[in-house]
Structure formats: C-alpha cells, structure tokens
Design a protein with these regions (language model features):
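Short glycine-rich anion-binding loops that position phosphate/pyrophosphate groups of nucleotides
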Residues: 1-5, 25, 99-101, 150
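Phosphate/pyrophosphate-binding active-site segments
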Residues: 11-102
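Glycine/threonine-rich flexible loop motifs
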Residues: 4-12
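Thiamine diphosphate
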Residues: 102-173
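Structural motif corresponding to alpha-helix initiation and N-cap regions
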Residues: 6, 78, 153-156
Length: 173
C-alpha cells in the first residue's frame, strides 16, 4: 500500500534490504521506483484450521504490553492522554488531534461509553482543527480537545472567534 505520513516509520522501512509493493495502483504507490518486487494482489491462501484462541491471546498480549509501557513512565504524552481521556465526564465531546494524539489514544486509552469522539482528516490532518473544535463545542455542554503544538499553530487565527466557555483544549508539545 501507500507509504505512511510518519517520517519515523518511513525511515525505518528504508533500512530494510528489500521492499515489496502489493497494490494494484503501482504508478501512484511506488513513486520512488525502489520496490524489489511488485505484486498486484496477495495470493489467496487457504487455511485448513484456525486457532480458536488466537484473537483472545492477541488481545490479552496487547493489554499486557500497554500496561507495561505505561507503568514505566512517570509522565509522558501517553500518560497525559490516558489521564485526560479517563477524566472526561459522560455526555461530553472529545476531539483528538491527528498524528501522535490519535495514535496514543488508540494505543493507551481505555474504551469508554458516553463520550462522543471526533477527529479531522485532511492532507496531514492538522488544518482547521481549532475551528472544528469550536464548531463541536456549539452542540455539547462540555467539549474537550487534545491537539499537538503544530496543529494548534496551523489554526491560530481561529482564536479570533468569540470566547467559548464550555471548552478545554490540551496542547501537547
């Protein structure tokens, strides 16, 4: 598939000796023409028996890994997002910024009910986030948002809008 927007992941992938592209849109996917091999689709594989505990084992391992990672950190972006998401009152809106915040929420926050979660997606997902947050706050008694510092700067002029009293924005640097 298409390369990611993450520089660190792309740099890591560039270290591999071989690159395999599996996608029918080759001309738009392997733009650097560096693929070692190109496939238009994955081969169809027949599985004769399924391990019935595989999914539950994977889920339990994931929970354990998340616990171990967060236990070793006294304060970090992950702990901050975990703390913020756990403290949201029911019935509130929660906007999660692109890039690190949304990845950390997915990886480290505990699922909850009674919270409406929102996110933007654009070319890089950071344009117009404050304006979106202000719009969301018009429909909820309490609105909370977590965004990165660059996301904040990309929509700084939105702060010219009238004051919103039911909104708390956390900016992660």
């Amino acid at each position: 598939g298409r390369t990611t927007l993450s520089r660190s992941i792309n740099s890591y992938l560039a270290l591999s000796g071989k690159t395999y592209v599996i996608d029918p849109r080759i001309s738009t996917i392997d733009t650097k023409r560096t693929a070692s091999q190109i496939f238009f689709a994955l081969p169809k594989l027949e599985v004769s028996t399924l391990n019935p505990t595989w999914i539950s084992d994977w889920y339990e391992t994931s929970k354990l890994a998340s616990k171990v990672i967060t236990e070793d950190q006294s304060w970090s972006e992950q702990v901050a997002l975990q703390t913020i998401s756990a403290g949201l009152p029911k019935g509130s809106a929660f906007f999660v910024g692109s890039s690190r915040p949304i990845r950390d929420i997915e990886a480290f926050a505990t699922s909850r009910s009674g919270i409406e979660v929102f996110a933007n997606r654009g070319l890089a997902g950071i344009d117009g986030n404050l304006s979106t947050i202000f719009g969301i706050s018009n429909s909820f008694e309490h609105t909370y948002a977590v965004i990165g510092d660059l996301t904040f700067l990309h929509d700084l002029t939105a702060l010219l809008a009238p004051t919103v009293n039911n909104l708390t924005v956390f900016i992660i640097d």
